[in-house]
Amino acid sequence: MALNLRKNHPLLKIINNSLVDLPTPSNISAWWNFGSLLGLCLITQIITGLLLAMHYTADTSLAFTSVAHTCRNVQFGWLIRNLHANGASFFFICIYLHIGRGIYYGSYLNKETWNIGVILLLTLMATAFVGYVLPWGQMSFWGATVITNLFSAIPYIGQTLVEWLWGGFSVDNPTLTRFFAFHFLLPFVIAGLTLVHLTFLHETGSNNPLGIPSDCDKIPFHPYYSIKDLLGFALMLIPFIALALFSPNLLGDPENFTPANPLATPPHIKPEWYFLFAYAILRSIPNKLGGVLALAASVLILFLMPLLHVSKQRSMTFRPLSQILFWILVADLLILTWVGSQPVEHPFIIIGQLASFTYFAIILILFPIVSALENKMLKL
């Protein structure tokens, strides 16, 4: 009998064990689609980014015009840029939904997979931040100035660190060139980390909506979930293409149509929508170092999720109190996102402070208390 190449070839068998014969729980829902959607986003971003890099010039005097040139004179340059800019938004939508799924269904108990995932989120945030600086518009320049300046809050070494990061005494040409280098490099780091993420995931297998072991009821990934992933791809690509073609600048800042000017500060400096929740937490603390620590904690708190799990059940499927708390957390993040886009004045300051407090309180205090209460109510 001839050997099956798919199962025996050194390279093909790796792909086979990851995408074809992978034993998968039979009951995973559409919430398990976001992993593959993130893979699709990453591939799209790397391809469009590579095409943009071919026409981009990382120099303060040429960056803005090189981007304008790409949009005006390069064949489909406008489309490539719009796909790349809006692809970032869809990347973050998918990763936030993916993390939300992980919290709801207790997927964070696969500790290695979860920790690599949080590192992936941090790398993605770094990539998006340095990428936003590259067009060298007003918001690019001032966003870079404000965010890099946060490092100066670190005691003793802060100022030196910031000047080392800038490559001078302000955000200037050296900053732009190194940010371009980072923006080119980091997506490949993300791709490498993704493989590690999947390697750890395939050690334990996927979790499922019931949060119970599913070894007794596994089905092959292909054709069942490969076709389901294709449906997910179509459902994401439709709004993505629609956004990129009909209103490509909807999520951008109009300030970025003005070339960077170190002598004129925009009236409201704010990051892209996907960073607004963290920006609101940063602004809600009147002390610089405190704000920076809260900003870091807002994302790093995810590392604590496995340690804060006290429930005897893995998933929230049969835990109505935890579910209510989870959806309050989601609403709270939406409020923080909205507050982050508003100016720093009376109602927004206090709303931001309350929402920031609620965010940390739910994750650090209320989730464990409510989980313990549910254990008691169910006599577990």
Curated annotation (Swiss-Prot):
Entry membrane topology: Multi-pass membrane protein
Main location: mitochondrion
This protein's name: Cytochrome b
Residue intervals passing through the bilayer: 34-54, 78-99, 114-134, 179-199, 227-247, 289-309, 321-341, 348-368
Gene3D superfamilies: Cytochrome Bc1 Complex, Chain C (1.20.810.10)
Top-level lineage group: Eukaryota
Positions annotated to bind heme b b566: 98, 197
Family as reported in the entry's similarity comment: Belongs to the cytochrome b family.
Alphabetical GO biological process terms: mitochondrial electron transport, ubiquinol to cytochrome c
